[in-house]
Amino acid sequence: MPNIKKLIEKMKQQPNGMRPEEVEKVLGAYGYVPARQKGSHKHYLNKETGDLITIKQERPLKRAYVVDVLNRIGE
């Protein structure tokens, strides 16, 4: 979990420089699992809450995707 905390801090301080793989690790730690992929977009589902989030697979991720993830995990 320490690596996840470091990634969350990086997301807060530098939201424009995140890679999709890093965000996927954070989502996985909070109960999100890959639901499906269609083209360049991956959908992650939280089975406990039913929340569905879409992340575009581009490098680096746009700030809006990172901020959305932070809001959904409660950071």
Label the model's feature ranges.
Residues 43-45:
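Short, conserved DNA-binding cores of transcription-related domains
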Residues 2-38, 47-75:
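Basic nucleic-acid-binding interfaces
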